[in-house]
Amino acid sequence: MSFTTISVIGLGYIGLPTAAAFASRQKQVIGVDINQHAVDTINRGEIHIVEPALGNVVKMAVEGGFLRATTTPVEADAYLIAVPTPFKGDHDPDMAYVEAAAKSIAPVLKKGALVILESTSPVGATEQMAGWLAGMRPDLTFPQQAGEQADVNIAYCPERVLPGQVMVELIKNDRVIGGMTPVCSARASALYKIFLEGECVVTNSRTAEMCKLTENSFRDVNIAFANELSLICAEQGINVWELIRLANRHPRVNILQPGPGVGGHCIAVDPWFIVAQNPQQARLIRTAREVNDGKPHWVVDQVKAAVADCLAATDKRASEVKIACFGLAFKPNIDDLRESPAMGIAQSIARWHSGETLVVEPNIRQLPKKLDGLCTLAKLDAALAAADVLVMLVDHDEFKAIPGDAVHQRYVVDTKGVWR
């Protein structure tokens, strides 16, 4: 069965680019999202997120009649579910969005349909999703019931793209295809090959789920090593960025760069899925998460020390000291604030500090709710002119272009080594 109509459930940072990629190949694409604002924005040919090159692709797809958005699922040949999978307070995965998405498409499923889960998920999630679908559609057969002869094919195919480069990497990167059966994998591969230039690498759904978690846990462990080095170097009076530069001259050493912590919807979340299912075995992965989650507290302590130094060297009162935090996103040059350590740091500073806390984030127009009323969103030049203490949290290009003399004779906490 060919794929004439494709539906993408969840039109966020992954779902919308995926929908746009299919639509750019002149496939009929129906995007589904519960956010009415996002739906209306897309149907105007505009985008509600920041991602280079995405806006033009969406505009052309909508104008060409290949992409439309709605809040209610409709019948399609293939469904791709790209909804959030956060963790709960106890770090157990929260599959509520996936369950809701699956149950929303169940009434419109037809024989021959393909359902792909893209959301980062714990091992076994694809089989669980298939169970939800089967429970709502006893008139259809699914892979866990009928194997290769199932009416509906199901696969797990995780994304592996870098925010800020999504429209390139979505097409160029290899794709892991984890079907519940070989037929499921073959059909999922055929779907992605509509736009994919990379290779479709086939496995089973459980291995594909674990592969995504493994990739991000590997990165988290390596970042934790760099972050722990930064704590040690601060204690020993050593420039950690110089140290890493020198150590990386060893032909078999490649240490990553430290920062204020780890954020985003993948690296800061996915390792907990492994830990939750394997608490006795995943000791290193848990420790890495704890190291990275602890880094923001250390940064706040450095800011408190900088304010104390400022007070000791001037005649200002604490309420007269202005602190400027540079960056809120979880990585450079994007507007995505999910799980951002910079957000938590800015919030902690503003709650502790009796003076004004300025925030500079060039990729947003208004502060998120958790900072509204605590901080002041400021322009770059205004913050540089007004602040006594400068806190570098995200190395956006605009910040890296700041000349050294602009921060001269200020109290600086630089978590990214931009002003070293």
UniProtKB/Swiss-Prot annotation:
Entry-linked SUPFAM superfamilies: 6-phosphogluconate dehydrogenase C-terminal domain-like, NAD(P)-binding Rossmann-fold domains, UDP-glucose/GDP-mannose dehydrogenase C-terminal domain
List of residues binding UDP-N-acetyl-alpha-D-mannosaminouronate: R160, V161, K212, N216, R219, H250, R252, G263, F330, K331, K416
Enzyme class: oxidoreductase
Residues reported in the UniProt entry to bind NAD(+): Y13, I14, D33, T85, T126, R338
E.C. number: 1.1.1.336
GO BP terms: enterobacterial common antigen biosynthetic process
Family annotation (SMART domains): UDPG_MGDP_dh_C (SM00984)
PANTHER family (UniProt xref): UDP-N-ACETYL-D-MANNOSAMINE DEHYDROGENASE (PTHR43491:SF1)
HAMAP family recorded: WecC_RffD (MF_02029)
The protein's name: UDP-N-acetyl-D-mannosamine dehydrogenase
